Structures are given as structure tokens and as C-alpha cells.
Swiss-Prot record:
Subunit structure, interactors included: In plastids the minimal PEP RNA polymerase catalytic core is composed of four subunits: alpha, beta, beta', and beta''. When a (nuclear-encoded) sigma factor is associated with the core the holoenzyme is formed, which can initiate transcription.
Domain of life from the UniProt record: Eukaryota
Catalytic activity: RNA(n) + a ribonucleoside 5'-triphosphate = RNA(n+1) + diphosphate
UniProt cross-references to Pfam families, sorted A to Z: RNA_pol_Rpb2_2, RNA_pol_Rpb2_3, RNA_pol_Rpb2_6, RNA_pol_Rpb2_7
UniProt keyword terms in alphabetical order: Chloroplast, DNA-directed RNA polymerase, Nucleotidyltransferase, Plastid, Transcription, Transferase
Cited InterPro entries: DNA-dir_RNA_pol_bsu_ext_1_sf (IPR042107), DNA-dir_RNA_pol_su2 (IPR015712), DNA-dir_RNAP_su2_dom (IPR007120), DNA-dir_RNAP_su2_hyb_sf (IPR037033), RNA_pol_bsu_bac (IPR010243), RNA_pol_bsu_CS (IPR007121), RNA_pol_Rpb2_2 (IPR007642), RNA_pol_Rpb2_2_sf (IPR037034)
Function of the protein: DNA-dependent RNA polymerase catalyzes the transcription of DNA into RNA using the four ribonucleoside triphosphates as substrates.
The protein's name in its UniProt record: DNA-directed RNA polymerase subunit beta
Keyword rRNA-binding: no
Organism the protein comes from: Nandina domestica (Heavenly bamboo)
Length: 1070
């Protein structure tokens, strides 16, 4: 019951621990379990037997390092070797060899895998646990219908149903249902055994008539009847071995395989004692399930809550990798059988090496990591993103739900989620509630359940004991939250505390409490735990904040937050972006590239990450924090990574903000900023883009990398070296050549005019035999070349082309259109950058850095930003940093407000600035207009908030089109920035233009600028010669397309011209 117990206080577990434990479970147990299932394989004459000796398998240390695997687009994996034997039964000879089975991708220190040079992570899936579940539904007459649903390990479902006459049916499909006696008899039980093994035999005897008794008279008859109903087959099928195999494959294997978890759940729910190694559904299970269903009908027993976490199981990385390994072993078995058969037919002598190929295992894992929905590319925007991605839990994926079919009840927060799944952190949109994040202290138990820790309160033991309980156990205990009495239960004045028992909230005496919470953060995910004063925010805004922190861009000069929660250091440590000393010693050398550490009689060189690109184009970089000659201890920070300072997470900047309107520039969440943030490089970030090109061997010959490209201006080729590749350190602009490449082509003489051929013959000009296919810098890619990699794949065949990658760094200051956000869901777009002399300024002359709209606070109910803003001002003046746990009101009422006001008062005293805390309007101050010097009419809240710059930047989004490609069918401009597309003037936009009566603009939008082919071709020529653009005479292409589509439906559409004089109809084709 109590999974784990240890004395003393609890520590926060590693944020990547769930991934590590899952992979270790796969290596320790899952690998051996699947290898043990590999059967002995014999040939058709049973003369040769092949088997694996799995007890001594070996996993070899990887041949390459992680960093090399990323740069060379390889997989960081270990080779699996297993001893195998080939036994000749006639001569009793055995041939034993150690064979290479395949490659298994390994998990690195970040909890991720590197497959084909890409960091990938496997997220946890939440599935319905196999077993039986009872529920009740009302039929069309308002009468309760009780059903029992048996869920198999494969996810297949079978239902038992009891009707008004107390007859029990087994539903094999939506439309077909048969008597419970038929499947029981088909599984091997006769009527006497059924009657002897049920609690209500009279009910089972009441409903079979003579015809039904004949159907279950023998096992063969029952199987035939069951097969007819299940497969909806008419006539009189004949019992045969193939019919049994088909029924076994289509029904019993998919719907009756319970697995070890399903067997445990079935035994618990039905009070059975069937051994755990019998994982198949037995007749005894079906009869016990029917008995419980009858009891439900008579008001005995309890119904199941399908959304309770005790009825769910976590499919972790261990289960997914083990499933894939089992699938690969099945494929290997089939391949070995085929190879043995082929060798015998051709009269060859096989060896274990010849029989086994590594392809099944290697390709299975490559396709799993590349194609499986639960294997995702690791989001590496910032260090927090990496941690949170590995702690996701999803209801989606194979065997799970879909975003369009999941009900509101499944998406909703359940009381059993408390302390296991964060009630705040989930995705927005169609997957809301389906993709969540595990709470900080949650862990995955042996049976796939989510466990959470408690402090056990016992009168016998005076020490504090931490225990982990699964959701099926903790609801039977009296559990109290970590309030003031729980933290200090020596106080006798408070005798009554709130508690939870069986998903109900009670108020009971302290003596009756059995368990209590261990940590204020234990209910939240990592992202939500980094929000200070989260208890003062609306949950929807806290959700937005935890999502937006994952979108923060690492800045060039990071800064620790003044107001935090205390988890920043743990988050930075577990992200792996900082360099940590593995043992104590002395620094003997340090530079930007490496740190050399001497200690324990050895010298260790620690390479540092230098301007490495993440998959979101952000810059990952390490900065040394130790100097030469310094003695360090084990675990000390040697170098800070991206978005970390002093080993703490630092995603944003502490800037001086004011909540006030300013000339309408902060209307609708827009943000007004000072030019200090631009020129002081406060919000400057580096972004690294990757451009690559491959060289192939074509039918005309190999492609060439060269700097001699004909017909191109020398200006575009100025940055190429003698090999035709751009030089390191070059500044490149849009359109510049990064890699010069020529592709061979055959020139046809017939394609040239006679005059061309004559001139070439006279002047001796050679025909060009190659076309230019250079790598050019696209729009918006200007920057500095920081790295070039020329990757030669082994083998050098046409199937392994050479790849050249060019990395370009961009320095981006904050500008109008960029998105910024606080840690309380307060987000906005930069609307204007003011000179610092025009910004509002404080009474000591300090200009404000940002101006937010005060109307963004009351309706959004995220008041935590006001507490952070005021406390940040006090911390900035006193040079203090605050780390505040949530729910501090458990100590006393208004604790947050008292803390903020006391710190403001102290800052006012120590700095001799009475305007910092004015009793008439505490937290507010009178500030002045920078343009006029006059004070504003009302006092304004000013303070220091921690503001993040998000990855949604205007440089990646702004787009314009003068000309470009058109869609083939509609002849309208393509959609999207990547295709150089245009904006579509849709139906509602046309209505808006009609409302203003702008007929000529509307005509241009619908013809010249869109899909009138002839008219848009005439525009360019007439514009050049200065002529008048002719009006389009016929209909645009989209209208003609509509006419054609109507014709395909046998509807002819024509229009007619009516004469004004004689009203004669002149027909004209559309």
C-alpha cells in the first residue's frame, strides 16, 4: 500500500527524473522480458533449431559523442549484441555466435534522445486502465440501464448489459447482442459449471429457452453461434479450425487480453484470486462480472467513475519502447524463419550471423521516433521549455482520445488530479484539458499509476515520514492541506481543520487527520510554480502565463528576477544548460571555448557550448563564471547557459513599469516602451538560422560546388571562398549566394535559333552544359555567418548525398510589433517606442521603461502582477531579491499585501524617498509627463516587473507581396508567408468595401490584383508606357470556375442582355 517511505524532510525530485526512471526500467526489465519471449525457431523438417541465449546480452557504449551526433545528423545509440545458437538435432551439434541485433537509441543527460541529429522526446500517455467498469445510463423511458464494460490491454471493449427482465446480454458490437451464456460456453464452460459458479443461479436458469439451451449444448455449437453473431454471418456455418483461428484473432486476442495491470484490476474489482500470470479473460471473470452486474441492478455495489485517476494508467517511455522492441522481435522472428527456409531449399549451411539482420530493430525504432505521435521534436526555445516538454501527459495518441471526440467531462479537472496533474498548465485550443503537465512531486508507480507524496501523521512515531500513495488508496485517508495548523500543530487553540475524504471536503478535528500535504507547490507543474503570487490570479491567466514562459527568448544579457518563487535554481539545474563541476578541484585554464579543471589526480577539459542553434532558432550559449586559479567544489556552477544567471533561471528583465493610459498607445493591451530598451540592448536577443543544400549525382553527372557561376553578378558572389562556400564572418544580405552549385544538363541544339548556332560557330562559344542551382539567402535572412559545416556521409553513393549547412546569426533589438508578456498572463504588442525624454518620469527624475494599460487588470483578475510590481520596486531600491511561496495567506490574512507594504515602507525610509510609500495611496505615486513636465491628474501604480520577450517577433511575421505565384485551379494568389502569398479579400471584406462605396478599389481587388488573368497581364505593360489600364471585360477566373463546377452538376449557367429599345433578349455565353 505504501510504496515508499523515508524519514526526514522531502526534497524536490529532479524534473527529468520521470524520463530517466522510465528509460532505466526499459533497459533493466523491459528489454529482458521481450528477449525472453523470443521463441525457438525450427525449420519445416525440424532438423535445425535457432535460439537466443538472452541471459548474457550486451549493450555497447556509443561510438560517437552526443555533440557529434547532432552535427553529423546521426543517431546517438547503443549496439545490442545477443549470443545465438544454431542446433543440428541429427548430429547434436551446436554453433554459437554473438550476433548484432540492432541499434537502440539512448537517452542523454537531458532525458531526450538524438535521432538523425534531432533531439526528440517521448511524452507520457494517459489511457483507460484495462479491467471492468460499471456505469448506469437512462434509456428513452427514463429507466436506469446498468452496463459493465470490459477493457482489454489492447484497448478493445466488450459490454455486459442487464435489461428490465434481469436478463444479461453480452454486446459484441453496437447492434448485436447475445446471451451471456453463449460467450461463457464458447470459452469452455458448460451450463452446470456456469450455475455452480454464480451467486444468482436462478437468474441464469430463468432466461434460456430450449432453443438457446441447444445453442450452448456443446462448445462447438456455442462457438458457431458466437461467430455468427460477431461476424454477422448468415446461413449455417460449419465448425472448423480456421473458424476458431479467425475468432481468436479478431475477437479474443483484441478484447480478452487483460495484461498484468488488467488482471490486477479485475481481481480487485471482482474479489477474485486468479494468479497474476494468467492475463487472459477466463469464464470465471465473465461470470463474476455478471454477478456484480446483477448486484448493481438490485442496489448493491458502487458505480465506477471512469475519469478518476485510479481508473487510468500512465503509458510511460518504458512501455512505449518495450512495445516497439517486442514488435521488432516479431519482425526478426519472421525474417529468421524465412531465411532458414530459403537456406534449406537452396541446400546452404546457415550460421547465426547469416540468419539475423539488424534491419528490423533499427528501422522499427527509427520509424517510432520519427512517426509516432507521442515522439515529438524537443522544444528548445529556452531552458524551461525543455523541462516542461518532458513532463507532459497526453490523452491523445494511439489507443487514446482525439481532440474532436473528447467530451467536456474528460477535459475537466478531477479531484483525483490533486497533486498529480497540474490543474492549471494545459494547452489552449482544441486540446485543452487533453494535454496536461505532471505536478512537481508526482511519480509513476510500478503498476502505471500516478503517485503523490504525503506526510504521515502518527502519534506513535515522532519523526516525519514521507509516503507515496496511488489514487486508489489516498481517497480512504483523511488528508489536510498545508495550512498554518498543519505546519505548526503544536498550537492547541486551533482544533478544527479542513480536510478531504473520498473527494469530499470536510471540517474535522486535528486528531483525526492521517495525512497532510508536504509542499505548497506540490499541486502545480514546473511552469505554474514559477509564477509569484499565483494565488491572486485567475486560473485562466495563470494558464496563459505558464504557456508564455515557455515562449520566452533567451536574451543577450540575462537578469535574475527580483520577485521569484524559489524554484528558479532547480529549473536551471535540471535543464542541463549550465556547466556543472563533476568533482572538486582547481581551475587551471578558462576561455570562451573550454574550462580545464584539475583535481583528484586528473585533468578534465569541459567544452562549452558556443553559439549553438536550437530548433526554434534561438541561441544556446555558455558563459564561464569561474576564473583561473579558483578552487571549486563538486556541483558548483562553472558556466551559465542561455537564460540563466548564477545558476538561476532568468527568462526576462526587471524593468520600471507604470499602469496608466498614454495617448491611446496602450489601447487593447498594446504596450508603450522607452528607447532605452532598444539602445541599451535590454531586450536584444540573438537568433541563429540554418540553411542547407545537398549535392546529388544526377543522370547527367554529379553536381559541383564551385565559385565560378556564369550569368550571376560578381556582387552576389563576393562572399564565396575558392571552394564555392561562403566564408566565416561574412555579412550577407538577402539574395546573396551562400553556396555556389552547378547541376549538369544536356543542351539540345534544336532548342536554339539558327542565328544563335551561327554566332556560336563563328565566335567559338561553348554551349552551357550546367544550370545554376545555388543556395541563396531568402528574404529576412540577413546576418553574420558564424558556422559552415560540410558533411560527408560514409559510402559516398548517390543515396548518401553530401550536405552543406550554413549558420547565420541575427541580432534583434526589440521593435514595434514584437510581443512581450509578464508572468501573470499580461501580454501585449509593442505599439510605439518613445524617446526617453518623452516618457513619464518619477519624482526622482527616473523615466519609466514600459507603460501598460490599467484596464488590463480588473477584468482579467490577475492581481498578482500588482503585488509583483510594487514588491519589485522595493527590491530594486533595497537591492534585495524575494522568493515567495504561494498561498502565504495560510499564515495570516492579507499576508501578501502586508509584506508588500512593509517592504515599500522600509524602502521609503532607507532611500529617504517619501514618494515610494505614501499612506494616502500606498503603492501609487504621482508621476510627471515627460513632454510637458506637468504631473498627471491621478497617482499611478509604478514598480519593477519581470517582463519577458516572446518568440512571436515581427521580423518572422511581417510580409508583403507585389507579385508572386498563383494557384493553378483558382488563379488566385497563394496563401502564406512561406509561399510569398497574398491576402485574400473574402466575402466579408467585400461587404465592408461595398459599405463604403469604393467601387474602383473593389474592382481592382477582385480582378487585377486577384484572378483576372488577361487584365493583370495588361497592367504591367500599360503602367510602363504610362497608358490607361483597360477595364476587364469578362468575368474573373474564380467565377468561371464556379460555372464549370455547376456544369459538372448538369446545371448550365448563362447570362442575357435585355435591349432597352425593344426588350429583346440577346443571349451571350458566360
Amino acid at each position: 500500500m505504501l510504496r515508499d517511505a523515508n524519514e526526514g524532510m522531502s526534497t524536490i525530485p529532479g524534473f527529468s527524473q520521470i524520463q530517466f526512471e522510465g528509460f532505466c526500467r526499459f533497459i533493466d526489465r523491459g528489454l529482458m522480458e521481450e528477449l525472453n519471449k523470443f521463441p525457438k525457431i525450427e525449420d519445416t523438417d525440424q532438423e535445425i533449431e535457432f535460439q537466443l541465449f538472452v541471459e548474457t546480452y550486451q549493450l555497447v557504449e556509443p561510438l560517437i559523442k552526443e555533440r557529434d551526433a547532432v552535427h553529423e545528423s546521426l543517431t546517438y545509440c547503443s549496439e545490442l549484441y545477443v549470443p545465438a545458437g544454431l542446433i543440428w538435432k541429427t548430429g547434436k551439434d551446436i554453433q554459437e555466435q554473438t550476433i548484432f541485433i540492432g541499434n537502440i537509441p539512448l537517452m542523454n543527460s537531458l532525458g531526450t534522445s538524438i535521432v538523425n541529429g534531432i533531439y526528440r522526446i517521448v511524452i507520457n500517455q494517459i489511457l483507460q486502465s484495462p479491467g471492468i467498469y460499471y456505469r448506469s445510463e437512462l434509456d428513452h423511458n427514463g429507466i436506469s440501464v446498468y452496463t459493465g464494460t470490459i477493457i482489454s490491454d489492447w484497448g478493445g471493449r466488450s459490454e455486459l448489459e442487464i435489461d428490465r427482465k434481469a436478463r444479461i446480454w453480452a454486446r459484441v458490437s453496437r447492434k448485436q447482442k447475445i446471451s451471456i451464456l453463449v460467450p461463457s460456453s464458447a470459452m469452455g464452460s458448460n451450463l452446470k459449471e456456469i450455475i455452480d459458479n454464480v451467486c444468482y443461479p436462478e437468474i441464469f436458469l430463468s432466461f434460456p429457452n430450449d432453443k438457446e439451451k441447444k445453442k450452448i449444448g456443446s462448445k462447438e455449437n456455442a462457438i458457431l453461434e458466437f461467430y455468427q453473431q460477431f461476424a454477422c454471418v448468415g446461413g449455417d456455418p460449419v465448425f472448423s479450425e480456421s473458424l476458431c483461428k479467425e475468432l481468436q484473432k479478431k475477437f479474443f486476442q483484441q478484447r480478452c487480453e487483460l495484461g498484468r495491470i488488467g488482471r490486477r484490476n479485475m481481481n480487485r474489482r471482482l474479489n477474485l484470486d486468479i494468479p497474476h500470470n494468467i492475463t487472459f479473460l477466463l469464464p470465471r471473470d465473465v461470470l463474476a462480472a455478471a454477478d456484480h452486474l446483477i448486484g448493481m441492478k438490485f442496489g448493491m455495489g458502487t458505480l465506477d467513475d471512469m475519469n478518476h485517476l485510479k481508473n487510468k494508467r500512465i503509458r510511460s517511455v518504458a512501455d512505449l519502447l518495450q512495445d516497439q522492441f517486442g514488435l521488432a522481435m516479431v519482425r526478426l522472428e519472421n525474417a529468421v524463419r524465412g531465411t532458414i527456409g530459403g537456406a534449406i531449399r537452396q541446400k546452404l549451411i546457415p550460421t547465426p550471423h547469416n540468419l539475423v539482420t539488424s534491419t528490423p530493430l533499427t528501422t522499427t525504432y527509427e520509424s517510432f521516433f520519427g512517426l509516432h505521435p507521442l515522439s515529438q521534436v524537443l522544444d528548445r526555445t529556452n531552458p524551461l521549455t525543455q523541462i516542461v516538454h518532458g513532463r507532459k501527459s497526453s490523452y491523445l495518441g494511439p489507443g487514446g482520445l482525439t481532440g474532436r471526440t473528447a467530451s467536456f467531462r474528460i477535459r475537466d479537472i478531477h479531484p483525483s488530479h490533486y497533486g498529480r496533474i497540474c490543474p492549471i498548465d494545459t494547452s489552449e485550443g482544441i486540446n485543452v484539458g487533453l494535454i496536461g503537465s505532471l505536478a512537481i512531486h508526482a511519480r509513476i508507480g510500478h503498476w502505471g499509476s500516478l503517485e503523490r507524496p504525503f506526510y504521515e501523521i502518527s502519534e506513535r512515531s515522532k519523526g516525519v515520514r514521507v509516503i507515496y500513495l496511488s489514487p486508489s488508496i489516498d481517497e480512504y485517508y483523511m488528508v489536510t492541506a498545508g495550512n498554518s495548523l498543519a505546519l505548526n500543530h503544536g498550537i492547541q487553540e486551533e482544533q478544527v481543520v479542513p480536510a478531504r475524504y473520498r473527494q469530499e471536503f470536510l471540517t474535522i478535528a486535528w486528531e483525526q487527520i492521517q495525512l497532510r500535504s508536504i509542499f505548497p507547490f506540490q499541486y502545480f507543474s514546473v511552469g505554474a510554480s514559477l509564477i509569484p503570487f499565483i494565488e491572486h490570479n485567475d486560473a485562466n491567466r495563470a494558464l496563459m502565463s505558464s504557456n508564455m514562459q515557455r515562449q520566452a527568448v533567451p536574451l543577450s544579457r540575462s537578469e535574475k528576477c527580483i520577485v521569484g518563487t524559489g524554484l528558479e535554481r532547480q529549473a536551471a539545474l535540471d535543464s542541463g544548460v549550465s556547466a556543472i563541476a563533476e568533482h572538486e578541484g582547481k581551475i587551471i585554464y578558462t576561455d570562451t571555448d573550454k574550462i580545464i579543471l584539475s583535481g583528484n589526480g586528473a585533468t578534465l577539459s569541459i567544452p562549452l557550448v558556443m553559439y549553438q542553434r536550437s530548433n526554434k532558432n534561438t541561441c544556446m550559449h555558455q558563459k564561464p563564471q569561474v576564473s583561473r586559479g579558483k578552487c571549486i567544489k563538486k556541483g558548483q556552477i562553472l558556466a551559465d547557459g542561455a537564460a540563466t544567471v548564477g545558476g538561476e533561471l532568468a527568462l526576462g528583465k526587471n524593468v520600471l513599469v507604470a499602469y496608466m493610459p498614454w495617448e491611446g498607445y496602450n489601447f487593447e493591451d498594446a504596450v508603450l516602451i522607452s528607447e532605452r530598451l532598444v539602445y541599451g540592448d535590454i531586450y536584444t536577443s540573438f537568433h541563429i538560422r540554418k540553411y542547407e543544400i545537398q549535392t546529388h549525382v544526377t543522370s547527367q553527372g554529379p553536381e559541383r560546388i564551385t565559385n565560378e557561376i556564369p550569368h550571376l553578378e560578381a556582387h552576389l558572389l563576393r562572399n564565396l571562398d575558392r571552394n564555392g562556400i561562403v566564408m566565416l564572418g561574412s555579412w550577407v544580405e538577402t539574395g546573396d549566394i551562400l553556396v555556389g552549385k552547378l547541376t549538369p544538363q544536356v543542351a539540345k541544339e534544336s532548342s536554339y535559333a539558327p542565328e544563335d548556332r551561327l554566332l556560336r560557330a563563328i565566335l567559338g562559344i561553348q554551349v552551357s552544359t550546367a544550370k545554376e542551382t545555388c543556395l541563396k539567402l531568402p528574404i529576412g535572412g540577413r546576418g553574420r555567418v558564424i558556422d559552415v559545416r560540410w558533411i560527408h556521409k560514409k559510402g559516398g553513393s548517390s543515396y548518401n548525398p553530401e550536405t552543406i549547412r550554413v549558420y547565420i546569426s541575427q541580432k534583434r533589438e526589440i521593435k514595434v510589433g514584437d510581443k512581450v508578456a509578464g508572468r501573470h498572463g499580461n501580454k501585449g504588442i509593442i505599439s510605439k517606442i518613445l524617446p526617453r525624454q518623452d516618457m513619464p518620469y518619477l519624482q526622482d527624475g527616473t523615466p519609466v521603461d514600459m507603460v501598460f494599460n490599467p484596464l488590463g487588470v480588473p477584468s482579467r483578475m490577475n492581481v498578482g502582477q500588482i503585488f509583483e510590481c510594487s514588491l519589485g520596486l522595493a527590491g530594486g531600491l533595497l537591492d534585495r531579491h524575494y522568493r515567495i511561496a504561494p498561498f502565504d495567506e495560510r499564515y495570516e490574512q492579507e499576508a501578501s499585501r502586508k509584506l508588500v507594504f512593509s517592504e515599500l515602507y522600509e524602502a521609503s525610509k532607507q532611500t529617504a524617498n517619501p514618494w515610494v510609500f505614501e499612506p494616502e495611496y500606498p503603492g501609487k505615486s504621482r508621476i510627471f509627463d515627460g513632454r510637458t513636465g506637468d504631473p498627471f491628474a491621478q497617482p499611478v501604480i509604478i514598480g519593477k516587473s519581470y517582463i519577458l520577450k516572446l518568440i512571436h517577433q515581427v521580423d518572422d511575421k511581417i510580409h508583403g507581396r507585389s507579385s508572386g505565384h498563383y494557384a493553378l485551379v483558382t488563379q488566385q494568389p497563394l496563401r502564406g508567408r512561406a509561399k510569398q502569398g497574398g491576402q485574400r479579400v473574402g466575402e466579408m471584406e467585400v461587404w465592408a468595401l461595398e459599405g463604403f462605396g469604393v467601387a474602383h478599389i473593389l474592382q481592382e481587388m477582385l480582378t487585377y490584383k486577384s484572378d483576372h488573368i488577361r487584365a493583370r497581364q495588361e497592367v504591367l505593360g500599360t503602367t510602363i508606357i504610362g497608358g490607361t489600364i483597360p477595364n476587364p471585360e469578362d468575368a474573373p477566373e474564380s467565377f468561371r470556375l464556379l460555372v464549370r463546377e455547376l456544369r459538372s452538376l448538369a446545371l448550365e449557367l448563362n447570362h442575357f442582355l435585355v435591349s432597352e429599345k425593344n426588350f429583346q433578349i440577346n443571349r451571350k455565353e458566360a
